[in-house]
Amino acid sequence: MDSNVTFKYGANDIAAQLRREINSGILQRFERLPPERSLSLKFNVSRGTIRAAINKLETEGLVTIKAGSGTYILKKYQVKIAA
């Protein structure tokens, strides 16, 4: 196996990491997410991959996207446990 191979994040991986940052308090409720460009550099992926991750979080109700303003955190991610 080539030791120079680096892990490439996918949209699901990035969404999961952002969820962890929200739950741990690194990212706070009503705080604006970093710009897509910053996130794409952080995760070494395209802005399209970042958009897909953010859209996933929006579908889950964790963030809201405000055109021209940014993406804002609405709430913490809650795992539902079956009784």
For every predicted segment, state its role.
Residues M1-A83:
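Short linear motifs at protein or domain termini
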